[in-house]
């Protein structure tokens, strides 16, 4: 890790409701192997030697988080999440900016990506240490891509050669990301991930190829796939 990265903190926006899962609770609180997805995700981040702290943004009326064992961990800090992802990330960044120890870089990671590999985090840190903007984990698009018309029929085939699936973590300098998110929200810009805020300001974040196993649990069938990946890792240990 480059010397300029004196402090690396992970930010986990976890205030979403995950309605597409059609479950009785937000998807981050569904269980795999006796632990919630959120616990798997945060423990994966905090076990990386470069990450000193995790700040998790949770809804103020969340009834689940306080019952988790990680809620009492000294290196896991809860802050109030917002209505949108960008609001939650900005809340965590504002908290960090008020601390006596400066946070140079942040890794923003989806609460529902419990399978991120340490080797991918290593690659992201290595690439961003020499990049002026920062970057994201991503995977190249492999399927043939079609653009639909208003009637949900194929309009044309899209060239996939320059297309990537954006993953997380996404890693940026804390001050730069704070300014970008604040400005974008003030202007009413739709922010779907942290990189899009930097793109809006004209920056060019790096793409760092990651593992396809770094899935986001969004649909019911994703839960079984995440369980498979985590079981495979457990068997290898």
UniProtKB/Swiss-Prot annotation:
What Enzyme Commission number does this protein have?
2.7.7.60
Instruction: Please give the Gene Ontology molecular function terms for this protein.
Output: 2-C-methyl-D-erythritol 4-phosphate cytidylyltransferase activity
One GO term (biological process): isopentenyl diphosphate biosynthetic process, methylerythritol 4-phosphate pathway
Quote the InterPro entries the UniProt record gives: IspD (IPR001228), IspD/TarI (IPR034683), IspD/TarI_cytidylyltransf_bact (IPR050088), ISPD_synthase_CS (IPR018294), Nucleotide-diphossugar_trans (IPR029044)
> Residue numbers for the site described as Transition state stabilizer?
20, 27
Q: Which UniProt keywords apply?
A: Isoprene biosynthesis, Nucleotidyltransferase, Transferase
One Pfam family of this protein, by short name? IspD
Report which superkingdom the organism of origin falls in: Bacteria
Protein name, entry field: 2-C-methyl-D-erythritol 4-phosphate cytidylyltransferase
> Which family would the database say this protein is a member of?
Belongs to the IspD/TarI cytidylyltransferase family. IspD subfamily.
Pathway this chain belongs to: Isoprenoid biosynthesis; isopentenyl diphosphate biosynthesis via DXP pathway; isopentenyl diphosphate from 1-deoxy-D-xylulose 5-phosphate: step 2/6
The record's section on SUPFAM superfamilies has: Nucleotide-diphospho-sugar transferases (SSF53448)
At what residues does the UniProt record annotate the site feature described as Positions MEP for the nucleophilic attack? 160, 216
Recorded catalytic reaction(s): these are: 2-C-methyl-D-erythritol 4-phosphate + CTP + H(+) = 4-CDP-2-C-methyl-D-erythritol + diphosphate
What the protein does comes down to: Catalyzes the formation of 4-diphosphocytidyl-2-C-methyl-D-erythritol from CTP and 2-C-methyl-D-erythritol 4-phosphate (MEP).
